[in-house]
């Protein structure tokens, strides 16, 4: 085994950053295959907190190659700022960080349009960082790729065409098109020089690494329930975080993916708008938010909190062929008298054990709960599964049964060492 996909099984914020940081030591390459700087990974490295938005978490290890592939949309300014922060912490990216020449560029007008559309249309809860509009341009075949951005004449021609196409919506919101164009051209002079050393054909890099049996970790952003096709549409992201997204988002054939690992929180959270069947509006919801420090790494927005939703996680396990699960934040459900698990949805006397596509059912369905006794005492610091409180062990085993996948690791904090190997000696690669 040499390739492993790590993805979120809920609405993002499952703790993928810590998990990827934990596994990255065993990998040679860490590859980000979709999304943009709308996602934030928070992790602790050598007792320092880091929040990464674009660069794969493996960059904190000096001997790892980190790739941003064609399925990602790249904001050059945001990337430069992120690298500057790493430089300040004496973490060099030179000769080990690469960007696909076919990745699409986020430009200032994408961010402006993102904000305009969020105000005018149904609120999706975007981060207003231009992700959706950049992907929209890609689909409309007017997008500007990294390779285009580096070629001055090509870029200027494409920019002109894009500004003509976007003039009505921008002018209507009071944007000075001439000033915007001048700003973009001026920024490009500096940013193209900054980008150029990192640009390559990442698909070929990955293919060559696979031939050499290198260990490759594919890192998703967001989570399955934000997937453009299989999430709570239209309250989704603009790309495919599921395992299938690796094939188109990194240029990797499906037969080259050896295993898929899902990251799942011991309860459920969601940021922004959209249906959320298990959402808690009471003191328990507040308890989970504060206990789990549930505030967005990118936006700082408070996350909506609820009980574990087995319908959602089982949906994710099936869609991505997940072979292993890592359970995070088990410590955040300690000291609760009774823990609930959503095992189905109910709408108009019909029971749904699989996740429904209907917007109406998603919005109005009631959760069907199974109740278990909670567990008391601090679980942080425990490194053996058998030493967890008996009710904590029962909770973990019940989750495995309900979602049809084994939980092989349990995370009890942000540090790498705050991890329990449930099944010893699992060969991740």
Swiss-Prot record:
Belongs to the adenylosuccinate synthetase family. It comes from the Bacteria. It comes from Endomicrobium trichonymphae. Substrate binds at residues 297-303. Its cofactor is Mg(2+). Pfam families: Adenylsucc_synt. NCBIfam families: PRK01117.1, purA. This is Adenylosuccinate synthetase. One of its GO terms (cellular component) is cytoplasm. One of its GO terms (biological process) is 'de novo' AMP biosynthetic process. The gene is purA. Keywords: Cytoplasm, GTP-binding, Ligase, Magnesium, Metal-binding, Nucleotide-binding, Purine biosynthesis.
């Amino acid at each position: 085994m040499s390739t492993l996909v790590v993805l979120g099984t809920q609405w993002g914020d499952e703790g993928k950053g810590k998990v990827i940081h934990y596994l990255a030591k065993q990998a040679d390459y860490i590859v980000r295959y979709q999304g943009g700087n709308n996602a934030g990974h928070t992790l602790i490295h050598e007792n320092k907190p880091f929040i990464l938005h674009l660069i794969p978490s493996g960059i904190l290890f000096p001997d790892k190659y980190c790739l941003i592939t064609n399925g990602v949309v790249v904001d050059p300014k945001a990337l430069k700022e992120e690298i500057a922060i790493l430089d300040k912490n004496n973490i060099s990216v030179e000769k080990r960080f690469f960007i696909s020449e076919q990745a699409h560029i986020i430009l200032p007008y994408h961010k402006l349009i993102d904000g305009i559309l969020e105000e005018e249309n149904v609120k999706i809860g975007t981060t207003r960082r231009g992700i959706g509009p950049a992907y929209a341009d890609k689909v409309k075949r007017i997008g500007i790729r990294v390779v285009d951005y580096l070629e001055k004449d090509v870029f200027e021609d494409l920019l002109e065409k894009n500004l003509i196409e976007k003039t009505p919506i921008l002018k209507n919101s009071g944007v000075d098109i001439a000033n915007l164009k001048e700003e973009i051209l001026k920024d490009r002079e500096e940013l193209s020089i900054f980008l150029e050393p990192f640009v390559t054909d990442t698909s070929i890099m990955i293919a060559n690494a696979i031939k050499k049996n290198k260990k490759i970790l594919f890192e998703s952003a967001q989570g399955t329930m934000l997937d453009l096709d299989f999430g709570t549409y239209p309250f989704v992201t603009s790309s495919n975080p599921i395992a299938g997204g690796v094939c188109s988002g990194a240029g990797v054939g499906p037969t080259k993916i050896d295993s898929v690992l899902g990251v799942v929180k011991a309860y459920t959270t969601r940021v922004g708008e959209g249906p959320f069947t298990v959402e808690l509006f009471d003191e328990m919801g507040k308890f989970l938010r504060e206990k789990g420090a549930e505030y967005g790494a990118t936006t700082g927005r408070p996350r909506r909190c609820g009980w574990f939703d087995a319908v959602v996680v089982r949906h994710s396990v099936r869609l991505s062929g997940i072979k292993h699960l890592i359970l995070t934040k088990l410590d955040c459900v300690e000291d609760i008298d009774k823990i609930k698990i959503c095992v189905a949805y109910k709408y108009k006397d019909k029971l749904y054990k699989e996740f429904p596509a209907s917007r109406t059912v998603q919005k109005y369905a009631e959760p069907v709960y199974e109740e278990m006794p909670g567990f008391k005492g601090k679980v942080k610091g425990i490194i053996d599964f058998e030493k967890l409180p008996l009710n904590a062990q029962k909770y973990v085993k019940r989750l495995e049964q309900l979602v049809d996948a084994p939980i092989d690791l349990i995370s009890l904090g942000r540090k790498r060492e705050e991890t329990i190997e449930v099944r010893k000696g699992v060969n991740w690669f």
